[in-house]
Amino acid sequence: MKNYGLNEIRKKFLDYFGERGHLVIKSFPLIPQDDKSLLLINAGMAPLKKYFTGEKKLKKDRATSSQRCIRTADIDEVGKTQRHGTFFEMLGNFSFGDYFKREAITWAWDFLTNELEVPKDILWVSVYEEDEEAYNIWVNEVGISPERVVKLGKADNFWELDQGPCGPCSEIHVDRGFEFDPREDAKPGDEGERFLEVWNLVFTQFNKTADGKYERIAHPNIDTGMGLERITMVLENADNIFEIGLVKDIIKTIEEISGVKYKENHKNDVSIRIIADHVRAMTFLIYDGVIPSNEQRGYVLRRLIRRACRHGKLLGINDSFIEKVIDSCIKVYESGYPELKEDRDRIVKIANAEEKKFQETLDLGLNILDSMLKETDSDVFSGENAFKLYDTYGFPIDLTKELVGEVNKTVDEVQFKKLMEEQKERARGSRNESNMGWSSDKKYGEELPETKFDGYNSLKDESKVIEIYGEDENNLKAGQMGIIVLDCTTFYGEGGGQVGDKGIIYNDNFKAEVYDTKKTGKKVFLHYVKVTEGSLHVGDKVTIEVDELNRRDIMKNHSATHLLHQALKDVVGDHVNQAGSYVDGERLRFDITHFEAVSKEQLEKVEQIVNDKIALGIPVKIDEMSLEESQSIGARGLFEDKYQDVVRVVQMGDYSIELCGGTHVKTTSDIQMLKIISESSVAAGVRRIEAITGRAVYKYLKERDRLIDNVKHSLKASNEDEITRRIEMNTEEIKGLKKKLKDITNKDLSSNVDSVINDAVEVNGTKVCTFELSGLDNNSFRDFGENIKSKLEDGVVILANSDESKVSFIALVTDSSVKKGVFAGDIVREVAKVCGGNGGGRKDFAQAGAKDSSKVDEALQKGIETVKSKLNA
C-alpha cells in the first residue's frame, strides 16, 4: 500500500473520475447558497440537492468533487477523543440519472485497489439485506469473496428521510486488524473500531411517499461520499485523523509555539487537538465569508476561535498565536487550495481581531468564574452567573458550560435563556402600534388576487378599489385610516430594503393620503391611507398618484447603495457583503459584513469612488433574465435570498451588477452627489454606513454653513481660516488651567492621606481605609488610592468617587494582604452590588461602577465587612 498524502489523494480522486466523463466541480463555499435548511455545508452532496431533484442542471449528468464540510454537533467531544473533528473534506462522485450501481461499485473498487493500491484482503463490504443487485455486482463482477460481503438492515444500509428520494447503500470498510478486535468472526456492523467505513455508495432509486410506500423513480441517482481524512489515515497507516501527515504538521507548529510536546500529557493533548482542528475550520470559514458574530454561522466561528484561544491559554501561551497556526494551515493546504494564500491577510486579520477581543476579557472572566464557582456548593451553576459572564465578559454559554463541566457542575440553562430573552425584550423597546381602529394582527390581502404593478414605468394611473380594510366594512370616510387594495397600482410596495411609496388616491368624491405601501407574499399591494375628504367604497374607480419628488429621492438613494456596495468591496475588501439595507427618501442605510471599523481614510476613498461614478453619468440598465444567465454575467445577490427562475438585474456599466427589484435612476448622474454621514457597529461582525444623496446633501451643506458661522461668531474669528488658530489658542489655555487645578487638587488630596489612614479600621492586623470623594477625574482618583496604599504595609484601600448620577469604586490591596486571601476583585464586587453596580479586576487592584450614589456609606461599610469575612474576623 503506497503512502499517499491527503493532497495527493484528493488530486488522484478528481483526476480519476474526471477521466471517466465526470464534471470536476470546485468545492462549494461552506455557506449554503439558496438553502435555508442548512447553517453550514455538512456533506458532499448538500450543495447538489437541486441537481438531484432536477431543479438545476450541470453541463454533464455526472460530476465529482472534494467538498469542504463543517459539522459542529460533536464540538464538545473534539480533542477529548481522537475520532471527532469539525472540519473535513468529502470526496464524492455523483450521477444525476446517468450511470447506476454497476459503474459506482466497480469504479470505487478500482480506485481503491489500483489507483491507491489498498490491499484487497483488508477491504470488506456491507450491502442492504434486500439489495441483491448490489450484492451480485460485488461478488460476481468485482470478485470479492462472499464471506467479506455483509448484509445489514435499514438502520445501517438504507438512506432515507421521512419522505422523498431514498435508497439502499453499500459501504466499503477497512479491516484495521486483530489489535482492535481479536475475534475471528468479527465483521462490519459489529461494535468497536476494528472496521473503519471509508466509502459510502448511496443508490437513490426510490421515492418514499407520505404514507410510507416506496415507489421506483424513473432515473435513479448515485451519491457517494468518502472522507478524505479517513482514507488518508488508511494509506498513511495512522491511528486517527490527528496522526495524518497534514495535521501533524499543524500540531508541530502548536508544539513550537507552546513549548509543549504532543503525546506526553493527556490534558495537553486535548488542547493541542482542539487547536489543530478548530484552526483548520476557522481558516476555511473565514475564507468562505463567515464573520464572527453572536448569531448562526458567525457564532459557530466565534466559538471555534474562542475555544482555540482558551486552550492556547491552557498550554501556557499568553500571547496571540492563532495567526501562526493559520499560516501553518494555509501552507499544508496550499497545493489543493492556492486561493488561501492569496486571501491570507484577510483571514488572519479577522481571526486576530476576534482573538484580541477575547483575550482582553479572558483572564478577567476566568477569575470571575473561579470566584463564582468558589461561592457555591451547588452542583448547578446559576443562569444568572452564566448570563453575567456572557453579557459582561463575552463568554459564550457553550464555553461556560464547558468550563463548569470540567468541575462536574451543570449550568441552569433555563434561567440563562430567560435572562437572554428579557434582554432582547428590553432591546426591542416598547413597540406600541398606532391605533388604526382595527386588528393589527390580521394578515391582509391573503385571499385576494395578485395586484398588477406598473410602478417601474409610470407614477400615475387609473385603478379600481377591490378591497378596503378599516373601521367600517367596504368603505372609508373622512378622518378614518385604513388599507386600500387596488386591481393595479403604480405605488412600490416595501421590499428589498426600500420603503413603500407615498402619494395620493382620489376621485371626484374622495381624497386620501397614502403614507405607506406594503406588499404581501402573494404580491397583493396594501395602500395605507388617511382619508382627508369624502368617502370611498369597494368597486369605486380612482386615480392613483405617487409622490414624484419622494420617489426620485428614493431612487437616488437605492442606486447609490449599489455603487456604495461595490466601492466598499474595492476599498475594504472583497469579503464585504451586504448584511441589510434601508432606503427611503431622506437617506440610505447600508449594513456590511466586516470585522472592524471602516477607517476614515477608507470612507473618504469609498465616497470619492462613488462620486466619480456619479459624475461619469453611467447608464443604469435593467433587464429580466433567468437566474443562471444572471449568474453567468456576474450578477450579485444575497446568499440567503430565494430568487425566482426569472430575476431582475440592475447593471451600472461594468462596475455594478446586482439582482434587485427596487426602483432606480436612469443614469448615475441623476444621483447628483453622495455624502457618507456615519459609520458604526450594529452587531458583532456587522458595520453600518449611513449616507445621503441629492437634495439631502444640499440641506446638509447648508446646515454645515450655518454651524461654521455660529462657530466663527463664538470664537470671534473673522473667517474660516482663523477658526483653527482660535481653537488651538483656547485649547492651550484650557490645558494650562486644568494643570493648575490638578496641582491644587493633588495638594489638597495629599493632605488627606494621613487622616484617611488614621481613621482606618484594623482587622486582625490589616488596616482597612475607606473614603468618599466627589467629582474627581479618574487619574486623580486612582493616584489618591495608590498614595494611601504606598503608606500601608498590610492594608486595604476602598474609595468611592460620586456625583449626582453615578458612583465609581476602587479597591487596592497590599501584597501582604493578598497573601492572606484578601482580593480587590472580591471586595469591589460586593461594594458595587450595594449601589446596583458590578465590576472586577486583579487581586491587588479592581474597579467598579454603579448608578445609585445614595448608598455610598452603606457600600463602604460592606467593603469592611467583606475584608473581615476573608480574615475570619
Curated annotation (Swiss-Prot):
Keywords: Aminoacyl-tRNA synthetase, ATP-binding, Cytoplasm, Ligase, Metal-binding, Nucleotide-binding, Protein biosynthesis, RNA-binding, tRNA-binding, Zinc. One of its GO terms (biological process) is alanyl-tRNA aminoacylation. Residues 424-443 are annotated as: Disordered. It catalyses: tRNA(Ala) + L-alanine + ATP = L-alanyl-tRNA(Ala) + AMP + diphosphate. Its cofactor is Zn(2+). GO terms for cellular component: cytosol. Its EC number is 6.1.1.7. GO terms for molecular function: alanine-tRNA ligase activity; aminoacyl-tRNA deacylase activity; ATP binding; catalytic activity, acting on a protein; transferase activity; tRNA binding; zinc ion binding. It comes from the Bacteria. Coiled coil: none annotated. It is an enzyme of class 6 (ligase). It is found in: Cytoplasm. InterPro entries: aa-tRNA-synth_II/BPL/LPL, Ala-tRNA-lgiase_IIc, Ala-tRNA-ligase_IIc_anticod-bd, Ala-tRNA-synth_IIc_core, Ala-tRNA-synth_IIc_N, Ala-tRNA_ligase, Ala_tRNA_ligase_euk/bac, DHHA1_dom. Zn(2+) binds at H558, H562, C660, H664. Binds 1 zinc ion per subunit. HAMAP family: Ala_tRNA_synth_B. Catalyzes the attachment of alanine to tRNA(Ala) in a two-step reaction: alanine is first activated by ATP to form Ala-AMP and then transferred to the acceptor end of tRNA(Ala). Also edits incorrectly charged Ser-tRNA(Ala) and Gly-tRNA(Ala) via its editing domain. Consists of three domains; the N-terminal catalytic domain, the editing domain and the C-terminal C-Ala domain. The editing domain removes incorrectly charged amino acids, while the C-Ala domain, along with tRNA(Ala), serves as a bridge to cooperatively bring together the editing and aminoacylation centers thus stimulating deacylation of misacylated tRNAs. Belongs to the class-II aminoacyl-tRNA synthetase family. This is Alanine--tRNA ligase. The lineage of its organism: Bacteria, Bacillati, Bacillota, Tissierellia, Tissierellales.
